[in-house]
């Protein structure tokens, strides 16, 4: 089975979910993102992720050109390993994220940012490649840096370093570290 046919259920999920969530008066999807990445272990795992974001209606320390805000990130990912056994899995995650960001309107529509997030991941399998993650529930923590650009920072390009592990709920805890690059689009 090719990567495209494995990712198809992920695409269908988001295409079905997106129109009603974006089109309503009480819209709960503010932006979407597409992410690709690799692990930095000897696992040779590729990651393909689609995400939906909902910004919090609150900011802090917003007296100057920089502010702290946050958002919820819901994503569905497909992990593909070179290993014939335990070669793939799906990952559904929910992560609250804090972001330090420059106001795009004060910086000619260019908005650098950094962010941190810790959330829960539900994996379809407990093993990927040679790694035994022990549980289907995992914690994901990440640090990210990026740049918003375009009209009001509508587009985003971001790098994330993400650590996924079971938090020593069960042994073994063979965590995995990921290098991810994302492109995002904000609806407003």
Roles of regions detected by a PLM:
Residues 1-27, 188:
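Cleavable N-terminal export/targeting peptides
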Residues 36-42, 54, 74-80, 100, ...:
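Transmembrane beta-strands of outer-membrane beta-barrel pores
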Residues 27, 41-49, 65, 85-93, ...:
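Transmembrane beta-barrel outer-membrane domains
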Residues 21-29, 57-68, 103-112, 151-154, ...:
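Short loop/turn motifs that connect adjacent beta-strands in outer-membrane beta-barrel proteins
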Residues 48-52, 175-188:
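Outer-membrane beta-barrel "beta-signal"
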Residues 36-38, 82-86, 127-133, 166-171:
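Extracellular loop and loop/strand-boundary signature of outer-membrane beta-barrel proteins
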């Amino acid at each position: 089975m090719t990567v495209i046919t494995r990712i198809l259920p992920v695409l269908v999920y988001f295409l079905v979910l997106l129109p009603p969530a974006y089109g309503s008066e009480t819209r709960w999807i503010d932006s979407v993102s597409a992410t690709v990445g690799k692990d930095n272990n000897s696992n040779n795992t590729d990651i393909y992720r689609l995400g939906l974001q909902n910004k919090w209606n609150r900011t802090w320390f917003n007296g100057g050109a920089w502010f702290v805000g946050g958002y919820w990130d819901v994503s569905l990912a497909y992990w593909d390993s070179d290993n014939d056994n335990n070669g793939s899995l799906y990952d559904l995650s929910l992560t609250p994220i804090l972001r330090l960001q420059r106001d795009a309107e004060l910086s000619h529509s260019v908005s650098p940012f950094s962010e941190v997030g810790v959330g829960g991941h539900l994996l379809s399998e407990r093993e990927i490649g040679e790694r035994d993650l022990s549980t289907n529930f995992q914690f994901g923590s990440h640090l990210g840096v990026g740049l918003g650009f375009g009209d009001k920072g509508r587009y985003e390009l971001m790098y994330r370093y993400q650590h996924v592990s079971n938090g020593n709920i069960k042994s073994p805890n063979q965590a995995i570290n990921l290098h991810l690059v994302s492109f995002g689009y904000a609806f407003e």
